[in-house]
Amino acid sequence: MAGRLVLGTRGSPLALAQAEACAAGLRAAGFAVELRRIRTTSDRRPDDPLSVIDQRDVFTRQLDEALLAGEVDLAVHSMKDVPTEVPEGIVLAAVAGRADPSDALVSEGGWGVDGLPEGARVATSSLRRRAQLLHRRPDLRVVEIRGNVDTRIRKMRAGAAEAVVLARAGLVRLGLEVPHAVIPHDVLLPAVGQGALAVAVRRGDPRLEEIRRALNDPAAEREVAAERALLRALEGGCRVPVGARAVAGGRGVLLRGVVVSPDGAALCGGEERGEEPEEVGRRLAARLLERGAAGILGFVRGVKP
């Protein structure tokens, strides 16, 4: 079938790099692809902390609306930004290749988390990162930061902080050579779906299977399925302090997860292994809730603006 596709994407350099990677795969499968930039809520409110934007789909809503309206044929998102429940009429056709999901600590000194000076300021807009960093280093001062990858690094270098936490996948995809340390997962577990790309299409699109064959990574799909099942069972979103990392191998999936209080004082963690990714995610969620995660998540929801 092939044919022409209009691919919707945010306009940031990272979003465009991710969209171009998917477009290349589609072109190799015989599609003609046009990229169309769409501004999302996050782009329109670049200086507002995510905690005050009362919207789970802050990075995806306008792309979803364009998809449902027929303005674009598919949309590419960072999987970590996609709510666990996608809008009616939209399906995730593919999980495109997953880069290293780890977080990176960017600083002029190239410090790791344990090497940061006492009381150092670390910039991040993520509650997940804040909570896990404070669990490891209660002395750190975590400061809010917004903007695309280049903007955050520039703000850090201008004196906003001694270091900034970014997804390592973003640095790699942008080809940025900056001093940084990859943060081990026993210090900072990634966001659900971090490093993977989500390809969304309209339900019933006759090209869905062709798009899937061109872009889907089965191992990444299994990993993401386990992580998103965990988050869904915890009734969380991108603004709750949940970290997860699934590793697919053979027929099984190993999933690790943590829920951490915003001040870092309390942490519930565990792991599960099994053959069915979503069942693994649900089992781990049940275990974490029994261990105290329910109280942490209830507190977080209660104190949000």
UniProtKB/Swiss-Prot annotation:
Its EC number is 2.5.1.61. Its cofactor is dipyrromethane. Disulfide bonds: none annotated. GO terms for molecular function: hydroxymethylbilane synthase activity. The modification S-(dipyrrolylmethanemethyl)cysteine is found at residue 238. Keywords: Porphyrin biosynthesis, Transferase. InterPro entries: HemC, Porphobilin_deaminase_cofac_BS, Porphobilin_deaminase_N, Porphobilinogen_deaminase_C, Porphobilinogen_deaminase_C_sf. Binds 1 dipyrromethane group covalently. Pathway: Porphyrin-containing compound metabolism; protoporphyrin-IX biosynthesis; coproporphyrinogen-III from 5-aminolevulinate: step 2/4. GO terms for cellular component: cytoplasm. It catalyses: 4 porphobilinogen + H2O = hydroxymethylbilane + 4 NH4(+). One of its GO terms (biological process) is protoporphyrinogen IX biosynthetic process. Belongs to the HMBS family. The porphobilinogen subunits are added to the dipyrromethane group. Monomer. NCBIfam families: hemC. This is Porphobilinogen deaminase. The lineage of its organism: Bacteria, Bacillati, Actinomycetota, Rubrobacteria, Rubrobacterales. The gene is hemC.
